[in-house]
Structures are given as C-alpha cells and as structure tokens.
Design a protein with these regions (language model features):
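Catalytic phosphate/metal-binding cores of nucleic-acid and nucleotide-processing enzymes, i.e., regions
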Residues: 2-84
Length: 84
C-alpha cells in the first residue's frame, strides 16, 4: 500500500469536506490500487496551503470510454477521510 500526494484546488476540497464528494477524477499515471492512501493537499496561488485530507481508496474505475472516461484516466472512490 502506498500514499499518493496530490494537489487539489480549494473548491474541490470544500466539496469533499462540506458537500459529501467521495471521488476524484485523475490521470491514471501513479499505479493507484484499492487500499492506497490519497493525500490531497490544497493549492492556492501556486503554493500549498495548510489544508488537506487523507483518504483510503476503496474503488477504482478505469477504461470505460463508453461512459466518457478517457483512456489514461481513472475515478478514485473513497468513503472516509481525515482532515489535516
């Protein structure tokens, strides 16, 4: 199991924390696996803020062009998260 440090814009971090968003659409270039940890760090004006979350990947959707998911991208699902 690995930890993937990723940038996230504030509006999308807000949606996770306040509006129940439980997925991320990402380039599938890091070898994501169910059970891995996402470390989503908020970025603003080109730098990191002190806000973010960690979450365990519980589902991965890949290679579904019939539903509009382009090759090379994936949707990462997670249930629970911890605010940093």
């Amino acid at each position: 199991m690995r930890t993937h440090e990723l940038k996230i814009r504030g509006i999308y971090l807000f949606d996770i924390i306040c509006n129940g968003k439980r997925f991320e659409l990402r380039k599938d270039d890091r070898g994501f696996e169910v059970g891995d940890t996402l470390w989503l760090r908020e970025v603003m004006d080109g730098g990191y803020t002190n806000r973010g979350i960690t979450a365990e990947i519980t589902y991965i959707l890949r290679d579904c062009p019939e539903y509009g998911l382009q090759k090379g991208y994936c949707i990462l699902g997670f249930d629970r998260y911890d605010i940093l």
